[in-house]
Amino acid sequence: MKIRKAEEKDIPRLLALLEQVLQIHAEIRPDIFIPGTTKYTVCELAELLKQEDKPIYVAVNEDDVCMGYAFCQMKEQPFSTNMIPFKSLFIDDLCVDQQARGQHIGESLFEYVKQQAKEQGCYEVTL
């Protein structure tokens, strides 16, 4: 399993995984979630991929098919009178394909995100 930044070619798989997540939410909370929808559209995903401060990391199999993702966002704590400025990497969403669970893909994605945060000088990783 390889982990890399998401690319435009990953959008169909990202949408499929986002749909899996939304389906779970819709089953648990049908009063607020609409089945068959996703958090982002194709266009929104394409725009997200261009934003350096919102990296999307994907775990891909030997055929380069996305089996899981971590949507992240770089946040900077601005200077205030009681805190020094620092950067953190926020994990907005993490998903592993339901057919690939139990293979430590989520754990690998989380470890990769932590390493990326460290390399980018982040103070912390938050969920």
Question: What are the residue ranges of the model-derived segments?
Answer:
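Hydrophobic adenine-recognition pocket in adenosine-nucleotide-binding enzymes
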Residues: A6, L94-V96
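Conserved beta-strand in the GNAT
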Residues: V58, V65-M74, C95
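A short helix-loop-beta-strand connector motif used in the catalytic cores of GNAT acetyltransferases and
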Residues: C43-V58
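A short beta-loop-alpha structural element at the N-terminal edge
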Residues: K2-A16
